[in-house]
Amino acid sequence: MSNDLGTRAGFVAVIGAPNAGKSTLVNALVGSKVSIVSHKVQTTRMPVRGVAMRGNTQLVLVDTPGIFSPRRRLDRAMVKSAWSGVADADCVVVIVDATDLVAHPEGMAARDTANILSELKSPATKAALALNKIDTMKRADLLPLIQRLAPPGRFAQVFMISALTGDGLEELAAWCAEQMPPGPLLYPPDQAADIPLRLLASEITREKLYLRLHDELPYAASVESEKWEEKKDGSVRIHQVIYVQRAGQKAIVLGKGGQTIKAIGEAARRELEHLLERRVHLFLFVKVRENWAESREHYRELGLEFPED
């Protein structure tokens, strides 16, 4: 099939161990926030598609959940989803936290990365390694890491980047663009993401929840946008429910006198107003649902396949 427009378009799977910088990288390449970021590992639960243009080439960047050794049902679904994103991609970027791997060569991230490399089935010509966070380390420490992770024949290219500062990102994007097949654009050129607004709103609130509570709340919370009402004045009224597994966790989310949930709501509302470019009325509720992580409906909302035991 001919392509008279001279455009190219395809999928780039961004994979790596938890907290390697996948979401920060995708957000930086897209130029706007499409995936939530926090210091907590396993923040991304579903594949998020960010859309970036480089000349006449469209990159659909799939921010996959971090790949690690799964234990819970939700963990298994996330890891399976990540590998599915790799199988469907036109090229793969394996991103690693170079500072962590140099400082802790036998640590969890190093083990997860080794497992990823052993399972990676993509042709070397379609795979690149991105050493992230180089702005915080000495270049002399990178050579042994490159020799360990990228022996000849494993990757087509190795890029030294900082997803936070932007170092090396244009070179990485240019290589990805070269891998895209000729064809029509998959999305309008001004579209930044492929994610329903209700789900994006839930993800933003979940990010603020994680950022606010740090280590007080484990991965036992989920956010769902139960009501989305467009108002005549152009504003939107959003009702969200934060589901936790125990009453004690509900108390943590609410905070003394409701101050914690108020702060979470204010932070989420400000970001939603910035993204939607209109006034947002956000109402948060906290409910205890012990088995939310076992709900098939929850998996469907996240676009994950429900793994059977």
Where are these regions (language model features)?
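Canonical P-loop GTPase G-domain recognition
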Residues: 125-128, 135-193
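Conserved, well-folded catalytic cores of nucleic-acid-processing
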Residues: 32, 51-55, 85-92, 98-99, ...
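Conserved glycine(s) of the Walker
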Residues: 21, 168, 260
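Catalytic P-loop NTPase motifs of RecA-like helicase/translocase cores
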Residues: 44, 67-69, 102, 137-138, ...
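P-loop NTP-binding site
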Residues: 197-309
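Solvent-exposed alpha-helical segments within well-ordered globular domains of core cellular machineries
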Residues: 13, 27, 46, 50, ...
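Conserved Switch II/interswitch segment of TRAFAC-class P-loop GTPases
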Residues: 87-114, 124-142
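Conserved G1/Walker A P-loop phosphate-binding module
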Residues: 1-91, 96
